[in-house]
């Protein structure tokens, strides 16, 4: 065990980056992620981290800087929130297409309008199909640990893909919690120095990202598809190795809570699921068979694991902390993903969506209680009268 400190999610991520011994960091301020860069700037200034700290003139520039640095063989880090995430959209696909294991922390924030700076998953979910590994931490400890795990997976020669290490703005980024900061020797055992054999080298000139003939594109896209498809195996290995070295065991895909004999569960990702667990625990004490399944890996989506582990429940409520206008079922991205994964099971598993927590609002105990009551009603009657509910307006 390392040193346990009471720190925020932002500071925890910064310690993860320090322990990863990154070479290049590029920053641009936007709350709530800014605290990560503030702490990293202090670490560099105080000599705790030997890294090149670059200030971008915007998020597009941030991603462009780490794109080039990674292509030159550096281990790199950047981050953003909200509209900053979408401003850099042009650069995400080139980074994954060039198979550069850039890591980007996203401390979620709602998009404009109305200019709300509260937490939502909408910003990060906009980027979900760019060929990056993506998942959410629900505590400061998990935010630090995911930083290390994602570098390990993304830099594996079987993968070579960038990663969005997501954490809920404010609910994780700013709230303090106990964090075991690992010893550097342990981290070096888990995360060896980055070695990419295909880097820019003036002694061996090459070109990156050129214009090509249309017929040359599909094979490259297929290679990227195969790389994303292969992430799960490497992620499983990394989580096993992490548990061996650090003593903290993470399921690669799902954090299940009180699900062994549950009849209904709430499925979602991020910090609000910790509140869902508290409500499930209370209802269990009253004799109700309820549980929670928190998704740890959003991309690549663990379809087979979802089928295997969640098809046994009578009803599943899906919490989407995002605004997805015009989407199928009037819910969110997670509801669509889950329904697609469980399509083969037809009406055996009833699903219903809950859109809540928009704009950084707290999803309260009472709201989760109402969700569980709706799920119990669906399990009993076998009828889904409405495919999705916006909380608190419709339930």
UniProtKB/Swiss-Prot annotation:
Keywords: Oxidoreductase
EC class (word): oxidoreductase
Pfam families cross-referenced by the UniProt entry: PFOR_II, POR_N
GO biological process, alphabetically ordered: oxalate catabolic process; response to oxidative stress
Recorded effect of pH on activity: Optimum pH is 8.7.
GO molecular function: oxidoreductase activity, acting on the aldehyde or oxo group of donors, iron-sulfur protein as acceptor
Reactions listed under catalytic activity: oxidized 2[4Fe-4S]-[ferredoxin] + oxalate = reduced 2[4Fe-4S]-[ferredoxin] + 2 CO2
UniProt EC number: 1.2.7.10
Matches recorded under CDD domains: TPP_PYR_PFOR_IOR-alpha_like (cd07034)
Assembly, per entry: Dimer of heterotrimer of one alpha, one beta and one delta subunit.
Its biological purpose: Catalyzes the anaerobic oxidation of oxalate using a broad range of electron acceptors, including ferredoxin and the nickel-dependent carbon monoxide dehydrogenase. Does not require coenzyme A as cosubstrate. Enables anaerobic growth on oxalate which is used as energy source by the bacteria.
Stored NCBIfam families: OxalOxredalpha
Protein name (database record): Oxalate oxidoreductase subunit alpha
